[in-house]
């Protein structure tokens, strides 16, 4: 709260900001504080499918294949023997070991997988495999939490401040060119005061 109050105080007491910017500060705070949050929330829900009907109902799991049947006990055994090994590393090791097995060694697990698939078809005759889409990672500059009103306000005011300064600079140069265009030409007969005045305007 202290940072937000100090930011507001500095904005209202500064002479660099135009009256239009100061009048629009409450609107900026209301419209910008949750702008990124709302867009990210809607994008996150669309990408992960949180509101889809498929997630409300329990999804039917796929029947296990031969590799899954074989790896159930092997994964449990490897995890107990290597408690610090990551799950991804265990999967790599199991995949390598499965490839090293002969067809005769794999055959019992293929038979078990066929039995499980037959039981699955009887239990779920209308089952169709629908792979899930992986949820995309949210941008780093976007948060699901409400944005800090002070930071959003300061960023908006800084942008308007830059535009305001550019307008003031253009107006100043325009006035200087207009005044220089009305100055009398400098010649040898001009007085020292006229030459000093012309030199002063050209140096601005």
UniProtKB/Swiss-Prot annotation:
Necessary for interaction with ZNF208 isoform KRAB-O: annotated span: 138-155
Record PTM text: Phosphorylated on serine residues by PKA. Phosphorylation by PKA enhances its DNA-binding activity and stimulates transcription repression.
Region (Sufficient for interaction with KPNB1): 59-136
Residue numbers of N6-acetyllysine PTMs: 136
One GO CC annotation: cytoplasm
Keyword tRNA processing: no
Protein family (similarity comment): Belongs to the SRY family.
Domain notes: DNA binding and bending properties of the HMG domains of human and mouse SRY differ form each other. Human SRY shows more extensive minor groove contacts with DNA and a lower specificity of sequence recognition than mouse SRY.
Name the record gives this protein: Sex-determining region Y protein
The species this protein was found in: Homo sapiens
């Amino acid at each position: 709260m202290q940072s937000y109050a100090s930011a507001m105080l500095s904005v209202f007491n500064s002479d660099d900001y135009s009256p239009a910017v100061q009048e629009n500060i409450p609107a900026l705070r209301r419209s910008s504080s949750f702008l990124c949050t709302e867009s990210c929330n809607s994008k996150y829900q669309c990408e992960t499918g949180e509101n889809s009907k498929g997630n409300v109902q329990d999804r039917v799991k796929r029947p296990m294949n031969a590799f899954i049947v074989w790896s159930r006990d092997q994964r449990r055994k490897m995890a107990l023997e290597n408690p610090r090994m990551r799950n991804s590393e265990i999967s790599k090791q199991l995949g390598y070991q499965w490839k090293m097995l002969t067809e005769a060694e794999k055959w019992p697990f293929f038979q078990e997988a066929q039995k499980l698939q037959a039981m699955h078809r009887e239990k779920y005759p209308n089952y169709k495999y629908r792979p899930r889409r992986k949820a995309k990672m949210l941008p780093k500059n976007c948060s699901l939490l409400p944005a800090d009103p002070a930071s959003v306000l300061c960023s908006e005011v800084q942008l308007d401040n830059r535009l305001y300064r550019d307008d003031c600079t253009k107006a100043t140069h325009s006035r200087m060119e207009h005044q220089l265009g009305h100055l009398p030409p400098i010649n040898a007969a001009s007085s020292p005061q006229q030459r000093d005045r012309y030199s002063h305007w050209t140096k601005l």
